[in-house]
A protein has these predicted regions:
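Helical subdomain adjoining the active site within ATP-dependent kinase catalytic cores
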Residues: 197-199
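AAA+ P-loop NTPase catalytic core and its hallmark functional loops
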Residues: 1-187, 202-217, 221, 225-246
Length: 246
């Protein structure tokens, strides 16, 4: 299960019910803007028209249903230019500023973030091409690391249900590999290989072809990227992974 699954489950858990109408998920990217998030002028048949953005509309929806909690999930939050996307909302998302209205950039309207709106941001710390979160935004969030779940009771039961010797050897090797990654000064725990590579399998779908594919086309290429300047380390660990599925 990946971080998206966890974020939605967290929202439903806090709600106490699975209500998809009170959860919205978007994904930030380099082209995502304040105009997409809050509001901005967009081309129309007659020129330009002021369009409301995803977060603006979500907040308005939550505002008229103040007795219920609403969850706005942002995937890949560190892929966007956060200062430009959030704009004046940097202040409005703080706990003690909720409900306080502020005039928006493109409108005379006063806008406030309702107290019943919760923001869940997800980020991949292993992507070297991405900047870390702006400190001004960072202090407005609580942080929680999602670690590989190989040792969880659920994954152990999953392994037992699959009952595949080669799969078990591969997982044990990946756990050893993760210990190596976590103590590597150029990598660290944020680069550990997650359990999502190995999920959603059934006893009749896990075979030598699948095992070969995940090792050769997913795990080994990842190691080549991690240790691009240490080919011998890549070679050694590649051989270790391959040996588990022979």
């Amino acid at each position: 299960m990946g971080k998206t699954y966890v974020a939605k489950r967290l929202a439903y858990s806090m709600m106490g019910v699975k209500d998809v109408e009170r959860v919205m998920m978007i994904q930030f990217h380099q082209s995502y803007s304040y105009e997409d998030f809050i509001m901005g002028f967009r081309p129309s048949a007659t020129g330009f028209e002021l369009k409301k953005g995803a977060f603006y509309n979500f907040c308005k929806k939550a505002e008229v249903d103040s007795d219920n909690e609403y969850f706005f999930i942002i995937d890949e939050i560190n892929r966007g230019n956060l200062s430009k996307i959030f704009g004046e909302l940097f202040m409005l998302i703080e706990n003690d500023k909720r409900g306080n209205a502020l005039q928006l950039l493109y409108s005379d309207e006063k806008f406030a973030v309702p107290k019943n709106v919760y923001i869940i941001g997800m980020m991949n710390t292993a992507d070297r091409s991405l900047a870390m979160l702006d400190y001004a935004l960072r202090r407005r969030f609580a942080f929680f690391d999602i670690k590989p779940g190989f040792e969880t009771p659920g994954f152990r039961e999953y392994r037992m249900a699959l009952d595949n010797e080669k799969f078990n050897k591969l997982i044990s090797c990946v756990e050893s590999l993760n210990r190596e990654i976590s103590i590597d000064e150029s990598l660290g725990e944020g680069f550990c290989i997650g359990h999502s590579y190995f999920c959603n399998l059934q006893p009749d779908t896990i075979d030598d072809s699948w095992l070969y594919g995940v090792v050769e086309y997913e795990l080994i290429p990842l190691l080549k990227e991690y240790w691009f300047d240490e080919p011998m380390k890549v070679k050694d660990w590649s051989e270790n992974l391959r040996s588990t599925i022979k």
